[in-house]
Amino acid sequence: MSRKASLSGFHEWLPAERLVEQHVLDTLRRTFELHGFAGIETRAVETLGQLLRKGEVDKEVYAVSRLAEDEEVAAGRREPKDPADPKRLALHFDLTVPFARYVVENAGHLAFPFRRYQMQKVWRGERPQEGRAREFTQADIDVVGDGALSPRYDADVALVMAEALGALPIGDFLIRVNNRKLAEGFYRGIGLEDTAGVLRSIDKLEKVGPEEVARLLQEEVGASPEQAAQALALADIRTSDTSFVERVRALGVTHELLEEGLTELADVVATLHRRAPGRAVADLSIARGLDYYTGTVYETVLVGHEQLGSICSGGRYDALASKGNRVFPGVGLSIGVTRLVMRMLSQQMAVASRSVPTAVYVALTADEDWSEAQDVAALLRERGIPAEVAVSAEKFGRQIKYADRRGIPFVWFMGRDDAGARVHEVKDIRSGEQHAADPADWTPPAEDLLPQVARAQD
Amino acid sequence: MSRKASLSGFHEWLPAERLVEQHVLDTLRRTFELHGFAGIETRAVETLGQLLRKGEVDKEVYAVSRLAEDEEVAAGRREPKDPADPKRLALHFDLTVPFARYVVENAGHLAFPFRRYQMQKVWRGERPQEGRAREFTQADIDVVGDGALSPRYDADVALVMAEALGALPIGDFLIRVNNRKLAEGFYRGIGLEDTAGVLRSIDKLEKVGPEEVARLLQEEVGASPEQAAQALALADIRTSDTSFVERVRALGVTHELLEEGLTELADVVATLHRRAPGRAVADLSIARGLDYYTGTVYETVLVGHEQLGSICSGGRYDALASKGNRVFPGVGLSIGVTRLVMRMLSQQMAVASRSVPTAVYVALTADEDWSEAQDVAALLRERGIPAEVAVSAEKFGRQIKYADRRGIPFVWFMGRDDAGARVHEVKDIRSGEQHAADPADWTPPAEDLLPQVARAQD
């Protein structure tokens, strides 16, 4: 992590770091599959028309073009294309927009409600800052229905993510839940009709503080000081149970949409409070910048690392995907895997027990033993023990050093007894202990079989 | 597979198809790790300077640019860039060139010989044809040394790939091995100095036949009819053991480089013949188009699907990566995962036993049982059994249909006995068999636990 990326914003991990990332991805996948989510991948490129459909112009998009075509344009042999041509190709900047397209295209082949997970790289041409990569991996789950989708899924997906994050060596986290209808209904109830504008200002609350947001609300949305104060009073409400409902009612605002949002959020928070106590709160300051959310919205902070921003965000979208009159409402959450792994590595929250999968390094006493040593390794691998074979009969000290540099715990020796018969011994190079072993039945302790990724000691 | 890609050359799988691809990737990863290869990923983008360093101009490269910049250029507010600017970004078209850069950049942090696997998407802006995707996944293994690398690794990597491919439900395959030194030494020995030109012509042998290649050799490389005949006689040699050596000698050509190549190839083929009988042959027609190979080269055909082209190719490269005077010779092989999976799916060589991970669908008798049903599912998941819970107490027929459409084998029912106590039953919806079960200890048969991907019946 002290290494500098050779291209700013494009991070690459060393093998031991990649093991931490792989552990995160494997753990997430395992949890998602235990909950019945099917894995899919979508292509890395979308048309600009698709990507910008929901007005996501604030995302810095990477366009893609065939080099041969660019050269023909530069040479005057081809007409330049409009850079904003909706048919132009660009790299996806999240997995939700591509998933919505996938659902619409494949609706006839999918069973709804469709539960899917998707773990892929995405790209944004942003200015790189700490925690802002230009290439990063997201891990998403979504449930999408055909026509309608039970509100129970709003709690379900958050519970799955709570379980997934809880299985990672990252310590405490808190899922903060709000509801767009609640917020929009409240704003309308106090006479602010530009609800998107209010949300944009409220979204800046943690960054700039309440006074600045009050000023923004008055200057940019035309709120009165009283309206600004009420919007801020709403955003100040945060409870771990459904008591937020009373606190909202105490503000004395009424609106049909507000009622709907209160009911929905109370249902979600009650379920989370019961099934994942301490993992979630109702937090009415959560806005989520994205236009396509229509109900529940989520953000997640890593406790003690709040300035990192949200590590797992999402929401309910009732109209992101549609095909003629047919709509596919969905709800989902997305983990920023790269952001999380960068933090895990830079803070040494988790470490891999070695840098290679190998558990046993089979040493060579004589060069011509190589094939027999491969037989030993093959016997070990048959029982799931990763093994490598030396390629030449160097001094044992050098062969042990090969294992030591990689953190390989065991070195296997093939010798001869006084009668000239083959004898096998295995050495734990950490303790120096060495004893006779049979390649057909020796096994290492379970914790040495594969590289372990664990929370580092505090 | 009958679906048409919405962007030509960019394939996306349905969930059941993705399970086949995932099975391929999991199997490869497992084999690579058992052999001590460490997984890494490199960024999707490289600079054009890196990508085109080895003269790979025949690959159609996708350039990447920030849309915002393109728009400024179009509006005349920014100078257009040279499309061939070596600092320009582009998507990688293979994993070998990026890996070479990674090794050079991180040499101080890696232990050599460095064994790594890498499974990622790559992109080529080619005209899509059957089997030629514009976005596809490659699975590579390479071993790279610091200064020198034992020739034993040339056999080692081929054996690992033979084991990996042998673990896939794809039937027979054959790794065809040749050696650049052997071929180049032979061509020089018969007086043909433009060895790259000869290789380019020989590379077309399977496509256009020997007569056309003879014509090409004479027209494009300036060979005499006798020289062309000798080059073709070499390419005609194919043996499963080291007897190719005698057959080459019988052609009466001598050259120092030829001798070196014969020795190297004989060593590799002898090892493969002994340790993976029937999986590999010496095939002196194998040329490999890429410039960077310097010794052993490999291609692999799927028996009965030869027209698909090579599914696993690679070779030894002694000079791809260097840093000042320090060189990092390597040898590796790359599986064309997408090409292979497309064939597996289109020929129905393998099928997934269901389209979702879920083994048990917990039905609801009453809406208010949802949380208790989640407790049942949680108990199952604790034992590694993927489970989903219904969100509403629809008619049992509809709930069973939900499971049936997805291929979920078991439906769990929560009822009450006459005394009002909770009773659990589980139904195998394939046989209709239903019996009492305890959520704390019931387990499905091993073959129903997770989706199975198996070779389809012939």
Swiss-Prot record, chains A, B:
It holds the Pfam family tRNA-synt_His. The keyword RNA-binding does not apply. Keywords: Aminoacyl-tRNA synthetase, ATP-binding, Cytoplasm, Ligase, Nucleotide-binding, Protein biosynthesis. The keyword Protein biosynthesis applies. It catalyses: tRNA(His) + L-histidine + ATP = L-histidyl-tRNA(His) + AMP + diphosphate + H(+). Transmembrane segments: none annotated. It is found in: Cytoplasm. GO terms for biological process: histidyl-tRNA aminoacylation. Its main location: cytoplasm. Its EC number is 6.1.1.21. It comes from the Bacteria. GO terms for cellular component: cytoplasm. NCBIfam families: hisS. HAMAP family: His_tRNA_synth. Belongs to the class-II aminoacyl-tRNA synthetase family. Homodimer. This is Histidine--tRNA ligase.
